[in-house]
Design a protein with these regions (language model features):
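Short acidic, low-complexity intrinsically disordered linear motifs used
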Residues: 1-15
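Zn2+-dependent metallopeptidase catalytic core
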Residues: 26-47
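Hydrophobic (often cysteine-bearing) scaffold residues that line and stabilize catalytic clefts
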Residues: 31, 35, 84, 125, ...
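Catalytic zinc-binding patch centered on the HExxH motif and its immediate surroundings
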Residues: 41-70
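Short pre-active-site segment immediately N-terminal to the catalytic Zn-binding motif
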Residues: 70-87
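Post-HEXXH active-site segment of zinc metalloproteases
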Residues: 81, 97-130
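Active-site recognition of the HExxH zinc-binding catalytic motif
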Residues: 85-98
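Long, well-structured alpha-helical subdomains associated
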Residues: 115-126, 131-198
Length: 198
């Protein structure tokens, strides 16, 4: 690692909530120090600003926004292997935000691209996140950090583009009716849509 990379690592902001997040997983599944470090490093390197377990108003297992990640606390009950896949999938989106920026990631909802283009982009980002999460899981197995026969699901591979197109169109109409035109407002909209106070 060269000097510039070292300085960047030192100056990186800490991910808000990460210690509590890791502790909640550890209290449930008693992870090795090596696994805790692997998950923590993966999250921090994504530039994720905040991460937390919370109740969700509906069945989604996670939500990635430009300013953080929410994981449905029900995912804690699905087994460590599946939970890791969900975390890796949502953090993969943080890497996408890091690579493309929030303007590109949110243009599906408020951008000038067509609904078809938006649906294709969204399907691609979801499929890439699934594949990335699968690779991270296989890396854990290969490094003998965990011992598992878990086969990570490809949750978005078989979702028809027409279904994603309909979802994008509905979100666009909703955001237009609420005059949502910025990344901050999109993040607030989705945060309030999924987070339950229970």
């Amino acid at each position: 690692m060269n000097l510039i990379e070292s300085i960047r690592r030192i100056l990186k902001e800490e991910t808000e909530g990460i210690d509590s997040f890791i502790n909640q997983i550890d209290s449930r599944y008693k992870m090795s120090d090596e696994l805790k470090e692997f998950i923590t490093d993966f999250i921090k390197e994504s530039d994720c600003k905040k991460i937390e377990f919370t109740g969700f108003k509906f069945q989604a297992l996670g939500l990635a926004l430009h300013d953080g990640v929410l994981i449905n606390k029900l995912a804690l009950n699905r087994g460590l292997d599946f939970l890791l896949f969900v975390i890796f999938h949502e953090i993969a989106h943080q890497y996408q935000f890091k690579k493309y920026g929030d303007t590109k990631m949110y243009e599906c909802y408020i951008g000038d691209i067509s609904v078809d283009e938006a649906a294709k982009f969204m399907k691609t980002t979801e499929e890439v996140a699934d594949e990335y999460a699968s690779r991270k899981f296989r890396e854990l197995v290969k490094k003998n950090i965990i011992n598992s026969n878990f086969v990570p699901p490809q949750m978005y591979k078989n979702v028809p583009l027409s279904q994603i197109r309909m979802m994008v169109d509905n979100y666009r109409k909703e955001m237009k009716s609420k005059d949502i035109t910025s990344s901050e407002k999109i993040s607030e909209y989705f945060y309030n849509m999924v987070k339950s106070e229970l």
